[in-house]
Regions:
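P-loop NTP-binding core
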Residues: 1-261
Length: 261
């Protein structure tokens, strides 16, 4: 039974999709069959894996509203052991439609259930909001990974996010847990960065990944080439950071790399 992890932050520009794409790719490279589920209407995880988000055909929108099973939407990527459930702009209207459907909080959970036996890890790239689609994701997953940028206002909205996770845990998904908090856009030369690190560790004791994701131009460039950074520039700082994050993530889950890229 594969583990499901939602990558969530209700604020854009924090490295959410970058983390979803590159962590999923790195885990696949280490020998584990991995699925990335793009449920962000912007579809940047979809394009970041080399697909045209304007021409995906069926998408996670169809899966969520019940027009097509997940198996029909599934796409193999050209990257090692990594598959994708793509998104497109149709998702932008899904919140309104889902609100009127039966079992509205469990649409994603029920849709992904047949795939959990086929994958070791399933990562969900959530919308940058705490709407009904994100609530659906939280109801469907085992854990939540929260990226936080090392910048001013880094903790903005975190209390609201944690409150939402607690409500979902109480009402719908009692087993959900915090997988970890990931510090992104890290620049150790800045005093502000050190202040943010201290604040985050105080807010999330024992939950902050030891690996940090640095500011890195290759991380910014890779999506425009439709590639995870490890395939775009294996030697870059960004690639090495996500490689190390995958190792730490696997260790937390009692796993070791089965192969090396």
């Amino acid at each position: 039974m594969g583990k499901t992890v939602a990558i969530v932050k209700q604020k854009g520009g924090v490295g959410k999709t970058t983390t979803a794409v590159n962590l999923a790719a790195a885990v696949g490279m280490k020998g584990y069959k991995t699925l990335l589920v793009d449920i962000d209407p912007q579809g940047n995880a979809t394009s970041g894996l080399g697909f045209n988000k304007r021409d995906t055909g069926l998408s996670t929108y169809d899966m969520i509203i019940g027009q097509a099973p997940a198996e029909e939407i599934l796409k193999e990527t050209k990257f090692s052991r990594l598959d994708l459930l793509p998104a497109n702009m149709a998702l932008a209207g899904a919140e309104i439609e889902v609100a009127d459907l039966d079992f509205r909080e469990a649409r994603i959970k029920n849709a992904l259930a047949p795939l959990k036996e086929k994958y070791d890890f399933i990562f969900l790239d959530c919308p940058p909001s705490l709407g009904l689609i994100t609530i659906n994701a939280l109801c469907a997953v085992d854990s939540v990974l929260v990226p936080i940028q090392c910048e001013f206002y880094a903790l903005e909205g975190l209390s609201q996010l944690m409150n939402t996770v607690r409500q979902v845990k109480r009402k719908y998904n009692p087993l959900i847990d915090i997988e970890g908090v990931l510090l992104t856009m890290f620049d150790g030369r800045l005093n502000l960065t050190q202040q943010v690190v201290s604040e985050v560790k105080r807010f999330f004791p024992q939950k902050v990944f030891s690996v940090v994701i640095p500011r890195n131009v290759r991380l910014s460039e890779a999506p425009s080439f439709g590639q995870p950074v490890a395939y775009y520039d294996r030697a870059s700082k960004g690639s090495r950071a996500y490689d190390e994050l995958a190792d730490e993530f696997l260790k937390k889950n009692g796993k070791t790399p089965l192969s090396h890229f």
